[in-house]
Each structure stands twice: as C-alpha cells, then as structure tokens.
Amino acid sequence: MKFIRILLLLSLAFGFAACGDSKFRRYTGPEVTQIQVHKADRKMYLIHKTEVLKEYDISLGFNPVGHKQFEGDGKTPEGLYLISHHNPRSRYHLSVGISYPNVNDLAYALEQGKDPGGDIMIHGRTNYNSRYKGDWTAGCIAIEDDDMEEVYSMLRKNTPIYIFP
C-alpha cells in the first residue's frame, strides 16, 4: 500500500510539472541549413537548403548601419559567421551565440589598437518590450520571446549565419 501511495504521489508530481509552460520547445522539422539576416529590412530567415522555414522581425544594434568593428560601436556585424552556442540562462530570455569576431574582424581591430567586442547573440526581448522600440541592442539581433523559443529549438551549433547590410 505504501508503494502505491508513493507511486501515485510521484505520478501527480510529474503530471503537474508537465503542465507548466516551458521556454524549451522541441523541434522535429527540417534541419535549418542556414540563417539569413537582412539588416536593412529588419528580417531574419531560417532556411532549409532553398526553402524559407520561418521569417522573423528583428531589432538590431542602436547604431545599425555598417559592419561592427569595435566594442561599444552599437553595430551589428555583417558577413558570414556560425552559431557558436546556446545560452538557456540569458538575461534576454534565451540566446544563441554568433561567432563574432572572426579572424578578419579581430585582425582589423587589433591593427587599429582597439577591442573588436564580442558576445554577439540572437536573443529575446524580456523586459525590453515596453521600454525600447526600434533598434536598441548593443549589436545583437533581438526577436520576440515566443519567437526566440522557436529559434532556440531549431538552431544547431555551427549553423552558418549570413548577415547582410
């Protein structure tokens, strides 16, 4: 009888835990083979081969025109990068890292005697929805939190991301 009672309590506990809203989603669709960001249009596309799987509205760095060169310039990088990691503990809901700076970015900044910056991400907007409109990040790509949950589940490490002006 004691065993049945424990089993029942565990079943209830797991059942209630499963009812909670989780920011971690499961994606079982086609592999995202590339990401394209079109800064001028404020759009991001997740693509499988030649098929656009998803399209998102984005916000960029607070000084978005041009390629990121230095720490604090407020620009979002341009060029080819890779998804470097997933961060489930981001202060912006969830985030995935972008491999900025690359070798060329680093060489240019060092040649100028400056820091290229880093920690560029695709992330959510937690607590920034009402305070900031338009481009507000330090150089990252921001999307709505619900969209970020979807993107987080769809992207894999080393997925190429092409960021166009």
Protein language model annotation of sequence segments:
Residues 57, 68, 75, 120, ...:
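Short glycine- and Lys/Arg-enriched binding-loop motifs that mark or flank ligand-binding interfaces
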Residues 2-9:
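Sec-dependent signal peptide recognition
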Residues 35-66:
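Post-signal-peptide N-terminal segment of Sec-exported extracytoplasmic proteins
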Residues 15-18:
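C-terminal motif of bacterial Sec signal peptides marking the signal peptidase cleavage site
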Residues 28-30, 37-39, 51, 76, ...:
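Short, surface-exposed loop/turn motifs at beta-strand boundaries within globular domains
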